[in-house]
């Protein structure tokens, strides 16, 4: 019975934290008087690092760039990180866990932080849509 428990797949969130965050609005206050027809660019990236046996850091990097014509309205980026305990998972499932499941856990935290920063910058509320990290992962491995 004890041997079965040792072999059982295990996943635990140990910590979720902001590793880095930045908000820049270089064209304020003049940009507040411009007709609000922005273009929004969203970039995502994920990095992983094995800290020690069965302990992994996953960092979801989210960068939002908003422009009106050629003028930068604001740039907001966050490195939302988590430390995860993952044991007894084969290599294929481990990669899926690190590059899909963990970013899915981290994204709502990053989205909330970005929304708060944008609001504090006195810009219209920004609600990023949910991201299908499973689809992104499967596209990446093809």
UniProtKB/Swiss-Prot annotation:
Q: Where in the cell is it found?
A: Cytoplasm
Q: Which UniProt keywords apply?
A: Chaperone, Cytoplasm, Protein transport, Translocation, Transport
User: Superkingdom, according to UniProt?
Assistant: Bacteria
* GO biological process, any: protein transport
Any single GO CC term annotated in Swiss-Prot or TrEMBL for this entry: cytoplasm
- Kindly give the Pfam families that the UniProt entry links to this protein: SecB (PF02556)
Principal localization reads cytoplasm
In terms of InterPro entries, this protein maps to: SecB, SecB-like_sf
Q: What GO molecular function annotations does the UniProt record carry, in alphabetical order?
A: unfolded protein binding
Question: What is the protein's quaternary organization?
Answer: Homotetramer, a dimer of dimers. One homotetramer interacts with 1 SecA dimer.
Tell me the protein family, please.
Belongs to the SecB family.
What is this protein's function? One of the proteins required for the normal export of preproteins out of the cell cytoplasm. It is a molecular chaperone that binds to a subset of precursor proteins, maintaining them in a translocation-competent state. It also specifically binds to its receptor SecA.
Q: What is this protein called?
A: Protein-export protein SecB
Gene that this sequence comes from: secB
């Amino acid at each position: 019975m004890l041997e079965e428990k040792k072999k059982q797949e295990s996943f635990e969130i140990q910590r979720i934290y902001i590793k880095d965050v930045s908000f820049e609005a270089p064209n304020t206050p003049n940009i507040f008087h411009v007709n609000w027809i922005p273009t929004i660019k969203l970039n995502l990236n994920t990095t992983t690092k094995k800290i020690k046996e069965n302990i992994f850091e996953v960092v979801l990097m989210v960068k939002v760039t908003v422009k009106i014509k050629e003028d930068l309205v604001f740039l907001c980026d966050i490195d939302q990180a988590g430390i995860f305990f993952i044991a007894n998972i084969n290599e294929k499932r481990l990669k899926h866990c690190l590059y899909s499941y963990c970013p899915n856990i981290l994204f709502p935290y990053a989205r909330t932080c970005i929304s708060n920063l944008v609001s504090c910058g006195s810009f219209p509320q920004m609600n990023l849509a949910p991201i299908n990290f499973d689809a992104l992962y499967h596209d990446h491995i093809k």
